[in-house]
Amino acid sequence: KLTGLLTLALQYGIDNIPDAILGREKEPLKNMLRPKNSEAPKEIQAEVPKWLYDKAVVQYTDHKALFEAMQQSAPLDLRVNTLKATPDEVIEELTQHGVQAEKGQYSPECVRLNIKPALTQWPIYKEGKVDVQDEGSQLIARLVQPKRGEMVCDFCAGAGGKTLALGALMKSTGRIYAFDVNEKRLAGLTPRMRRAGLSNIHPAVIRNEHDLRVKRLYGKMDRVLVDAPCSGT
């Protein structure tokens, strides 16, 4: 059993595995995964590349706390689709399934989970009440301040996370052009917008900024979002 749990811990991170699965093996596993050789190079103990360790030591007084924080798993942020639910309703539904959730710190639509469940299999996801999106990306959409009935262009839409957020903020009114040069990434937007119940988004693959589809819209947009490179990275 311990070998199997160790494999899971190495693959997903021990903090992402529920205590109900780890049981009494949690502490032994943590000890196994914790560097023990104090004679090992400092960057090995910190589990970071040497170049990063050297820079951090110079730039940060409390670099040990930084390295410890880097070893922690990031929480999972959801954006609540306010066309179908409220953050309070989503938190209540998650709580009923035994998942601890809380509101985000900055985005009104953000709900943060302490674990990373198989969310895509849950009704709350399939029904389009939530979508996975980190709080920072949610704020990008809010900074655009889209209004109902406006013409908006998401110039580097990618898989459409911020496009969907814009669509919800506009209450599925107006028109959003979702452009990207990567056809494969943009293809993921269509099923997501259907699940979200949005009808104001129009995805299109373009060659570059001089594409005819873009030229036709010159001077017609109320707002344009250009998030390049993607803030999510």
Regions found by a protein language model. Give the residues of each.
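S-adenosylmethionine
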Residues: 1-233
